[in-house]
């Protein structure tokens, strides 16, 4: 049986990058970029948005965009609680929308 996607967190240095996946995706969407950044000594965190990466595809339909925005804010808070004063944010597709919102609302 195939395993379900999980958040990706790799702590390396005081430079942190938050990677946000696409709608109906998972941290696997940004795994290659995460590995590249890790090799360059960046700390990388790619959370799993609520309702994504489950055995029941309809779980995603039960969520609202504000839930995913809260997931994004929690991810930023997690990295700041880990001691990172500056967090770079990148997103793919839907994740890109939340990345831009994060940069606009939490510069």
Q: Which residues make up each language-model segment?
A:
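Active-site signature of alpha/beta-hydrolase-fold catalytic machinery across serine-
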Residues: 101-105
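The conserved beta1-alpha1 loop
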Residues: 18-24
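Conserved alpha/beta-hydrolase
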Residues: 38-57
């Amino acid at each position: 049986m195939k395993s379900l996607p999980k958040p990706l967190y790799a702590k390396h240095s005081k430079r942190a990058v938050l990677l946000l996946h696409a709608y109906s995706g998972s941290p696997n969407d940004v795994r290659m970029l995460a590995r590249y950044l890790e090799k360059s000594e960046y700390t990388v965190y790619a959370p799993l948005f609520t309702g994504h990466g489950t055995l029941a595809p309809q779980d995603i339909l039960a969520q609202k965009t504000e839930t995913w925005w809260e997931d994004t804010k929690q991810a930023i808070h997690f990295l700041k609680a880990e001691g990172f004063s500056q967090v770079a944010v990148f997103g793919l597709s839907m994740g890109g929308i939340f990345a831009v919102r994060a940069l606009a609302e939490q510069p």
